[in-house]
Amino acid sequence: MEKLIFATNNPHKLNEIRHILEGKVEIVGLDEIGCREDIPETADTLQGNALLKAEFVHKRYGLPCFADDTGLEVEALDRAPGVHSARYAGEPTNADANVRKLLEALSSVPHPRKACFRTVIALIDDHGKHFFEGKIEGTIASECRGSGGFGYDPVFIPEGHTLSFAEMGEETKNQISHRALAVAQLRDFLLCAK
């Protein structure tokens, strides 16, 4: 498989995936194939949303495709925002508003405020559907820390670290993140399939 479509319009995710794959697979984003549609995420699970997006692109363009969905699951909030992480503060999506809402919801919760980030990737190719999952445990900080990354990165501190994803820099984050773990599984699968 030489080229693979990544069903996203999110430039941060696209760059992160390309960086993690280190050029071993050519990744093409949706706008590079002329797809400007916002693919609805209406499933109740991360796997379901990833599959919806991958199926949409695969059916429309007939190309091997993968999509991901990521959720931040906070123990004190019964695993919320979870599958609703991107739209936690409502539509349209707004990362800063999502983080503010999360910190407000946790304002009376004592530390450590345990959480995990989960990414599920759905790949559709000529051989069928394949799923890969990455998960990292951590805690939620009291306030935003750092200026790197995107989404909930400024408030998520991975287990075993003292820096938030936003503080630790792209290189370190891309070695340990939930997405990195899922993409490593995808990469290994693709390289074995060659």
Curated annotation (Swiss-Prot):
It holds the Pfam family Ham1p_like. InterPro entries: dITP/XTP_pyrophosphatase, ITPase-like_fam, RdgB/HAM1. Its EC number is 3.6.1.66. It catalyses: XTP + H2O = XMP + diphosphate + H(+); dITP + H2O = dIMP + diphosphate + H(+); ITP + H2O = IMP + diphosphate + H(+). One of its GO terms (biological process) is purine nucleoside triphosphate catabolic process. The active site is at 69 (proton acceptor). GO terms for cellular component: cytosol. One of its GO terms (molecular function) is metal ion binding. Its cofactor is Mg(2+). The keyword DNA-binding does not apply. Substrate binds at residues 8-13, 70, 150-153, 173, 178-179. Keywords: Hydrolase, Magnesium, Metal-binding, Nucleotide metabolism, Nucleotide-binding. Binds 1 Mg(2+) ion per subunit. Mg(2+) binds at residue 69. Pyrophosphatase that catalyzes the hydrolysis of nucleoside triphosphates to their monophosphate derivatives, with a high preference for the non-canonical purine nucleotides XTP (xanthosine triphosphate), dITP (deoxyinosine triphosphate) and ITP. Seems to function as a house-cleaning enzyme that removes non-canonical purine nucleotides from the nucleotide pool, thus preventing their incorporation into DNA/RNA and avoiding chromosomal lesions. Belongs to the HAM1 NTPase family. Homodimer. This is dITP/XTP pyrophosphatase.
